[in-house]
Amino acid sequence: MYQEDYLRNYIKESELRVFNDRIKVRLSSELAIKYDLGVYTNFLTRIENEMKMLDKLKIKSPANAKPILYIYVVPDDNFTFLLQMPTLFFKDKKSGGKPVTCYDLDGFPLAYGLSQNCLENKETDNLEIADLENELHELSHIVLSQFLLGNQVISEGIAETLPLYCLRLEEKFEKYKQVIATLEENNIYSLKELLNKQRDGSYGNDAVLPNMTCSFRLSYISSYLFVRGLLERVEEKYLLSTTEAINYLFSILRGNRGYANEFFIYDIADALELPHDELLNKKDIQRKALNSIRRLEM
């Protein structure tokens, strides 16, 4: 049954603004006036700087492409509708954003969809570490979309791993480290449990602390520990740097686009020469990652 794509219709009628050679913005004619007045410049400059942080990881785009980051700005009054924000997390929120389908051929497969007041009202100086990590999380999803779409469990794990582990934000994120320090193995989900939560729509419905970012939900923490554990395994097994290990992992993901089930995990297990059951049903990888985090605190 055909379902109308309202965001696509909005983008069709939008105006285009070129912020620089790597960021372009689409927005309504009313919001374009604010863009032209410089209202969004500080926010976009911060996004540019955050993309430069991810550049340090030297992620190799397929075919050496240089996709554009598109930012789709929508009005506050219907952002949940246009961006299809999950009601579980955004029922009473007045602003928000998330990666959405990119309709521009020179962009990443995903664009960054944002309500207008995210650009207008967010603090641009002295950004809290939680907010910085959260923005890098969303941008990581967009970069990752070149390699993987559709597997929430792995995607969320990578989107957490890039800023927290690879960019070392975890070392400065005191509240997050405090939460990690309290976790035991029975608090962490296995990959099988995470895949089941993805299927039944309960992934992320398990906050450790109220009113915090997704990093403080057990599903996301479990996915993070899994992907971090995979990277540490690759680094150790093949004597690779973290940036080299990222590209190795992405090469595995790129060869398995579209899987969202156990077979995807089996392919990862085969590539890393790990038993299927160990990766899917046990928590050895997550436990080792958890222990490596705790060692940093000693």
Where are the regions that the model predicts?
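Auxiliary, metal-adjacent structural segments of Zn-dependent hydrolase domains
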Residues: 36-121, 125-129
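Fold-level signature of zinc-dependent metallopeptidase catalytic domains
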Residues: 12-46
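Pan-zinc metallopeptidase signature
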Residues: 3, 193-298
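Sec-exported extracytoplasmic/periplasmic mature domains
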Residues: 52-59, 141-145, 163-171, 231-236, ...
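Solvent-exposed, acidic/flexible segments
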Residues: 36, 40-47, 124, 128-136, ...
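Surface-exposed patches in mature extracellular/periplasmic domains of secreted proteins
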Residues: 54-72, 145, 150-155, 174-177, ...
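Zinc-dependent metallopeptidase catalytic helix centered on the HExxH motif
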Residues: 103-181
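N-terminal low-structure segments adjacent to metalloprotease catalytic domains
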Residues: 1-21, 291-298
